[in-house]
Regions:
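Short proline/glycine- and acidic-rich turn/helix-capping motifs at secondary-structure junctions
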Residues: 143-153
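Short secondary-structure edge/capping micro-motifs at helix/strand boundaries
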Residues: 35-36
Length: 173
């Protein structure tokens, strides 16, 4: 587990997961050599997952580095909020992501797909999350969607959820 400078992080601290995999297939991103180089460091490779090792050496995956939100200088991992929100009655699916914020750089937004026939509103979502999360982890904006945009693999396509909020914004965090 390495920090952004490529140094090992202490036990329990979140960093970028790197692995040594000699049988890893050699590939390149067409027209983007920097993307390939960013995945490798001193013979180690990363797929962009964040995690930490506990005192017994067990690995805990926290989130994807590309999904992390930095709000007011604090790193927030959307997967933590999503795991709580998915427990809310009436929620079929959800995604949490960063949107521009003039004061903090980024703020949290949640896209919520209600279960068929469920009637939930933003106030109920916040009321459900509030006792379980720190206040800075509460989404400032709740959007309700009929269907989540999905990649071919079935994963939620968060970039499509973020894009409308970031269009016209010069700086993307």
């Amino acid at each position: 587990i390495l920090d952004t400078q490529g140094l090992r992080v202490p036990t329990g601290q979140v960093g970028l997961i790197h692995v040594h995999q000699p049988a890893y297939a050699d590939f390149s991103y067409v027209g983007n050599d920097d993307a390939r180089r960013s995945m490798e460091r001193s013979g180690l490779k990363t797929m962009g997952d964040l995690g930490y090792l506990d005192e017994e050496g067990f690995l805990f995956i926290v989130d994807r580095a590309s999904d992390m939100v930095i709000s007011g200088g604090v790193n927030i991992y959307p997967a933590e909020i999503e795991s709580v929100l998915q427990l809310m009655p009436g929620v079929a699916d959800c995604a949490v992501f960063g949107i521009p914020d003039g004061e903090f750089g980024e703020a949290l937004a949640a896209a919520v797909q209600p279960q068929p026939g469920a009637a939930i509103d933003a106030a109920q979502v916040i009321a459900f999350l509030k006792p379980q999360l720190a206040s800075y982890k509460l989404p400032r904006r709740i959007e309700f969607v009929c269907d989540m945009p999905r990649e071919d693999t079935g994963k939620i396509f968060k970039r499509k959820l973020r894009e409308p909020f970031w269009s016209g914004v010069a700086r993307r965090i």
